[in-house]
Amino acid sequence: MKIKLIDSVVRSFKVAKIFRENTDKINAIDFAPNGEHLISCSEDDQIVIYDCEKGTQSRTVNSKKYGVDLIHFTHANNTAIHSSTKVDDTIRYLSLHDNKYLRYFPGHTKKVISLCISPVEDTFLSGSLDKTLRLWDLRSPNCQGLMHLSGRPIAAYDPEGLIFAAGVNSESIKLYDLRSFDKGPFVTFKLNQEKECDWTGLKFSRDGKTILISTNGSVIRLVDAFHGTPLQTFTGYPNNKGIPIEASFSPDSQFIFSGSTDGRVHIWNADTGNKVSVLNGDHPGPVQCVQFNPKYMMLASACTNMAFWLPTSEEGL
């Protein structure tokens, strides 16, 4: 039985399960494409994997030596990539079932601030404060492509995995064709440069029509993916700590979810720009990560705690 996401259903979300596995803030989360598992990483150097069907924590893996950030499931079962917070700025490919590294991807000389995996194949993109964007293949430790940019780059693949977007210097979005990225971007959208904050994340909507820009301030932007036209600006949530708060789409691209430093989850209608709801969970600290499950009607949000949310209204049935 599929529930349709409408305003009343979104407002009915309540915390169904809270996990207190971490001793420091959770800095990244990622759902497996089939929606069955969620992976998280924290500043306490722990990687925690959750079972979304059972609503349980299934295992914990430590990354004490290198630290862990920007974690993503890869397409193979039980594997993930992540950036490092200690030693160096190498990206690491981890086998989760035996906690062994399968491969290292060295190259970046400063902190990696963006990491995304292709939705269709075993390639991934990384952006760093060294002002480069690198394209990688999981099967090779050598960088497959290198783009030198004029400022801090963040990246995202489109849902088809054919193009990628690079957000540069919090003021422009460049679109590249993956088959000919070495020719440079095929289009560049110039936006007004952020005065108060930096862009910290890009995401395409599932329908590929819009791009969501997250920041380390209290503003989220939505732009047209074909023309770069600004569509919406979402505000009215606090971020007084300058943290990179994640904004996410619902799978139907209709709603935008964001964390905040007030420990709540803020939700807007993507078409109208109107605030739909503010959800109160069991978050004593800033909520940095919020994502909607790609297959199940569930939402995850994280501060130091991890919260799983479920709708309590049947109206959308």
UniProtKB/Swiss-Prot annotation:
A cellular component annotation (GO) from this entry: Set1C/COMPASS complex
SMART domains with a match to the protein in the record: WD40
PROSITE patterns in the record: WD_REPEATS_1, WD_REPEATS_2, WD_REPEATS_REGION
Repeat as UniProt keyword: yes
Keywords tagged on the record: Nucleus, Repeat, Transcription, Transcription regulation, Transcription termination, WD repeat
Location within or outside the cell: Nucleus
Domain of life: Eukaryota
GO biological process: chromatin remodeling; DNA-templated transcription termination; heart development; negative regulation of DNA-templated transcription, elongation; nuclear RNA surveillance
WD repeats, residue ranges: 21-60, 107-146, 148-186, 194-233, 238-278, 282-317
Function: Component of the SET1 complex that specifically di- and trimethylates 'Lys-4' of histone H3. Together with su(sable), part of a transcription termination checkpoint that promotes transcription termination of aberrant RNAs and their subsequent degradation by the nuclear exosome.
Protein name stated in the entry: WD repeat-containing protein 82
Origin species: Drosophila melanogaster
Gene name for this UniProt entry: Wdr82
